[in-house]
């Protein structure tokens, strides 16, 4: 159901983001968060914003200083429980907030006006596409300069300061431009509440002369941050459960597939519950890996059309009914729109909507409540899983390399698989790491993240920084190609400053391999770097870092043993040198199909 948003329509714009609206990522749906008591003298705008970030769990803010946000940064630093992390550039600060939100449920970044805001824009767009609540804070112009026809620095030379705001309007679910104190409290609280409720980024611009000022609205006690709960329409819920149960109970060999919107719906537990009670085999869409329990006894792998896990596509596409929870069917996840699925066989469950076959459709239904209720109505049916067991033949492990034989990528990932546990998390960069990491069977508690919808190469460096900062109980294992790394390498420096102990596998194959398989050309070849030498230079004997260049399996085994043993408390950077044409068979198949989809001729006019 839609909830009323309170705000100043001239400064804040509230709008529904899409159908992927679920329950809250950090706080419970009826949470009232009480701030600590403060005196009126200390109740400034900057402190109010900082305090709110701490209350929602964003206890680290990734920032790049600029003259418009310096005073605000002082207040963020001064807030107990809040840590300001300086990044090398705004893009990586945004990527770090993205990674942080994946682990913590919400992230935050702070940049300066326009030159910083437009630089972080790409990362915020990625967070929007992945349904991640990121609070993007911008230090804005002095409030006295609005409407004066003055031309300011850090702008495009026009007296109108709205260019940055207009850019953010399409990639955030709420925008607050705070250029007066009277409604600043309301605007900040509305923006943060909207980010949590919609699970999308928001934009908050704070005038550079306002952060240190007090206002009576900041000193009222208590000042709760109230998040209005989302509730299912009970009648619709009952009808939807009845229709879906009747549809699925008539099927002979139904299956279940988890999609990426399970995250925004906070439905991981509900999905696991219905999987347990129904007896159906469970698969996962590639963009939802890590959201579905792969240790479950009836887990059959990744459903990704022609590049699915062995025998998974055969079971899913031959089913006479499939329950998809939170799917996104884009050109990447559908392998160029080549999935062999039929809508009339599907029950599609989105975070707030259910569609049974070709109809009917039921709105205002929370995924969690629907799956919990449906689990009680389904007849147990293991037929599809029994079929899977009859045809399943385990994949063979790649043979061990010969002494001094050049290392192969499949050998690398065989050894990465052995590193995984509930105390690790995998970050997979856009590229061949997508396909190789999909084959990793995740143990219980092992995290997994990648950016499939937006697919911005270089994302994983900042995301590794943010995820590791948020999930300090896990050791992050990051797999990134050389081309992607050249986009965002600088913030390995920030990892060292933060004392992180991630393991980064830099796969050096001399170019943009994923682009080669879609459409080759000389533009896909890059200048080779001495990557370990670069990290050693960034390290500069300041921090805890270990690097290694690996060319053979024997060297890889030794490097992993060191990274997980003597150097377990270090940031470990392992450069893997492989042949430029050493790619997974899945990338070859996927690339050819996506290329075909991209090169379709125009429709006749």
Swiss-Prot record:
Binding locations of substrate: 67, 154, 515
Keywords: Decarboxylase, Lyase, Magnesium, Metal-binding, Thiamine pyrophosphate
Upper lineage: Eukaryota, Viridiplantae, Streptophyta, Embryophyta, Tracheophyta
Reaction catalysed by this enzyme: a 2-oxocarboxylate + H(+) = an aldehyde + CO2
Similarity annotation: Belongs to the TPP enzyme family.
CC cofactor: a metal cation; thiamine diphosphate
GO cellular component term, pick one: cytosol
Enzyme class: lyase
Molecular functions per Gene Ontology: magnesium ion binding; pyruvate decarboxylase activity; thiamine pyrophosphate binding
Record organism: Oryza sativa subsp. indica
InterPro entries linked to this entry: DHS-like_NAD/FAD-binding_dom, PDC/IPDC-like, THDP-binding, Thiamin_PyroP_enz_cen_dom, Thiamin_PyroP_enz_TPP-bd_dom, TPP_enzyme_TPP-bd, TPP_PDC_IPDC, TPP_PYR_PDC_IPDC-like
Record protein name field: Pyruvate decarboxylase 1
Description of how the protein assembles with itself and partners: Homotetramer.
CDD domains hit by this protein: TPP_PDC_IPDC (cd02005), TPP_PYR_PDC_IPDC_like (cd07038)
Cofactor binding comment, as recorded: Binds 1 metal ion per subunit.
GO biological process, alphabetically ordered: aromatic amino acid family catabolic process to alcohol via Ehrlich pathway
SUPFAM superfamilies, A to Z: DHS-like NAD/FAD-binding domain, Thiamin diphosphate-binding fold (THDP-binding)
Binding site for Mg(2+): 482, 509, 511
EC number(s) from the headed UniProt entry: 4.1.1.1
Record region (Thiamine pyrophosphate binding): 432-514
Superkingdom per UniProt: Eukaryota
